[in-house]
Amino acid sequence: MVDPARARKLAKRIGTIVATAIDHEIKDPRLAFVTVTDTKVTADLHDATVYYTVMGADLESEPDLAAAAAGLEKAKGVLRSKVGAGTGVRFTPTLTFVADTVPDTARHMEELLARARAADDEVARVAAGASPAGDPDPYKEPRAEDADDAEVDEPSGSRQAD
């Protein structure tokens, strides 16, 4: 086991090395729109998981996840050698590439929030034209003290006998 801070620093360094290598050194067109989003390293520093996203060529096109995964698998050996040269650790971690689901989850959450905002706006629109049920002032009026109440409130020893 190793210090968690060291594992985090190594994970960050591996992510930087892999992202730089994908951008500048690997000439595979399938990796043109791949972005490294996160990297995790196991506690024994033997395995590294690299999370990535793939964007489409333009805003309307769907990303080709299968082609990007195949390109990363093909470049895995080159990327691992770059990581070994760039980190200087005794054992170069094996690289595993996983498509990151965070952007899809975030998009789904945004859709749910937009739907909730629309429902809130609808409720506010309906409530604007509504009138309250019952009396306008639903709270009870304070009771006025009657003469009968005043007699009850007097202490029992202070009453005069007839």
UniProtKB/Swiss-Prot annotation:
UniProt xrefs under InterPro entries: KH_dom-like_a/b, RbfA, RbfA_dom_sf, Ribosome-bd_factorA_CS
GO MF annotation list: ribosomal small subunit binding
UniProt keyword list: Cytoplasm, Ribosome biogenesis
One cellular-component annotation, GO: cytosol
Pfam family, one: RBFA
Domain of life, per lineage: Bacteria
Compositional bias segments (type: Low complexity): 125-136
Localization (cell): Cytoplasm
Family: Belongs to the RbfA family.
Function: One of several proteins that assist in the late maturation steps of the functional core of the 30S ribosomal subunit. Associates with free 30S ribosomal subunits (but not with 30S subunits that are part of 70S ribosomes or polysomes). Required for efficient processing of 16S rRNA. May interact with the 5'-terminal helix region of 16S rRNA.
Subunit architecture: Monomer. Binds 30S ribosomal subunits, but not 50S ribosomal subunits or 70S ribosomes.
Name by which UniProt lists this protein: Ribosome-binding factor A
